[in-house]
Amino acid sequence: MKGFLKPNFSLGALFLTLSPIATACIAEKPVNNRFNFNSEQLARLRKARVNHWRDGDTLEVSFANNHQKPIRIYAIDTPEKAVLSIQRKSEIELKEANKATEFAKSLIPIGSEVWIWPLNSYSYDREVAAVFFKTNPLQLHFESFAVEMVANGHALPIAGNDFDFVFSDLDPFNPLKIVGIELANGLNNAFNNRKNIFSYLENSFQSITMVYQQRGVDQSWTRYLAPSNDFSSTKLGLGLTIYELKLNNG
């Protein structure tokens, strides 16, 4: 996914000058991480079993034919475990990366069943896909791994360059069209309550610039914030938020 905002990018310096009060008291909606798919959507899912968690947004699974594959989870980004640049090495980022990995392992332990929704694209050796799971094997609804990670402050929701098409020209079976609003609800909950990656520095936005040091921040995460939030993409002139796109496109 594209659209990364490097730690020393000029917009980042501008955002840091904004008042901490700007992040307070933004309305949020409860997160509903329950999804019921129709027959066409169910046909997109591939059942798999979790073999290993590389980090909070990458896992390795095996399918019924015993074929094994690494999966890069679509639409989220967790802090980086690998040290890509000594100059940008951050103990805080490593701490949050490890917390994200451990949360993923506790949410979906090794050996658990998951349902993979492939996007027919790759990131290095990893197939990009949405991941769904069931807390109870008897339940009919599915839960989104991405929504759970974001709502608990372990990941940022991202959309790259496709965001403007989420509620218009994007493939109607793209999982982001289904889970996008709940990703936004989860983000606003974590942001307002300063959970994990949002718990550093003077406010939640500044905290992100502190945590995501290795690769910078994909600025599309601001498009999931409530329009009234002073750090939302609408207020910063980076495009409409997902709430506004849904309102405009149904």
From Swiss-Prot:
Lipidation sites of kind S-diacylglycerol cysteine? Answer: 25
Signal peptide bounds = 1-24
N-palmitoyl cysteine-type lipidated residues: 25
Magnesium: is it a keyword of this entry? no
Bilayer topology reads: Lipid-anchor
The record's section on InterPro entries has:
SNase_OB-fold_sf (IPR035437), Staphylococal_nuclease_OB-fold (IPR016071), Thermonucl_AS (IPR002071)
Please verify whether the record's keywords include DNA repair. no
| Transmembrane regions | none
This protein's source sits in the domain of life called Bacteria
Q: CDD domains in the record, alphabetically?
A: SNc (cd00175)
Q: Name one GO cellular component term.
A: plasma membrane
| Disulfide bridge partners, by residue number | none
Molecular function via GO: endonuclease activity; nucleic acid binding
Q: What keywords sit in the KW lines? A: Cell membrane, Endonuclease, Hydrolase, Lipoprotein, Membrane, Nuclease, Palmitate, Signal
Q: What is the annotated localization of this protein?
A: Cell membrane
All residue ranges annotated as the TNase-like domain in the record: 44-200
User: What protein name applies here?
Assistant: Uncharacterized lipoprotein MG186
What is the native source organism of this protein? Mycoplasma genitalium (strain ATCC 33530 / DSM 19775 / NCTC 10195 / G37)
